[in-house]
Amino acid sequence: ALGRKNFIISNSNRDAVTWIDSWPNWPVACNGLNVFGPKSSGKSHLGAVWQSRSKAVQLNNPIVDIMKVPEILNNKKNVIIDGFDESWPGIPILHLYNLIKEREGFLIIISSKPLAQLEVLPADLSSRLSTLPVVEIKQPDDELIKQVMQKLFEDRLIADVEIFENPIKRTYTQDGKINFNGGD
């Protein structure tokens, strides 16, 4: 369930949710947004919320053929790119960006790092992307994890919420994964 009502808000994602909820009433010169954060932090879920509201085209894989850009966009004007990194060829994205701007549409780019920390080429694309506001979704905090676990239990009709009264300890593995252990 990737709808807005299923997206749980906490301090770790509140800024990003505020941006998405305020669309299309973004500042006048703002035609897009870069949402970044760690893996499994809710970026794609929040992107799906915006994609549904905006009727945007969603791209999860790099565009390699510049000639396909108009076909990909079809008659739409909003695009969400999920999983953007330095491996995406820049020329098709530059063409896509210009077409979105021409149609007065919006572009959301979801990435693990802020676009400014990526080596985006060509320079024209890097310059255009640098104008996008940037919002971070942080590592899920304890309150968010508690609410997500509670929702998962409720979805499975396990209604004994008393188990959430005990603190949950988190430890991080070297690869950034979270291990959960019961509290003391």
Describe the function of each predicted region.
Residues 28-46:
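Walker A/P-loop nucleotide-binding motif
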Residues 145-148, 159-171:
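Short conserved motifs of the RecA-like P-loop NTPase core
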Residues 72-99, 103-112:
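Conserved P-loop NTPase "ATPase switch" module shared by AAA+ and STAND
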Residues 164-165, 171-184:
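The conserved phosphate-sensing helix
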Residues 132, 147-158:
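Conserved AAA+ ATPase "sensor/coupling" helix adjacent to the nucleotide-binding pocket
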Residues 117, 132-144:
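Conserved AAA+ ATPase "SRH/arginine-finger" region at the nucleotide-binding site
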Residues 1-15:
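Dynamic helix-loop-helix/coil hinge segments at AAA+ ATPase domain boundaries and subdomain interfaces
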Residues 115-130:
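Short regulatory helix/loop adjacent to the ATP-binding pocket of P-loop NTPases
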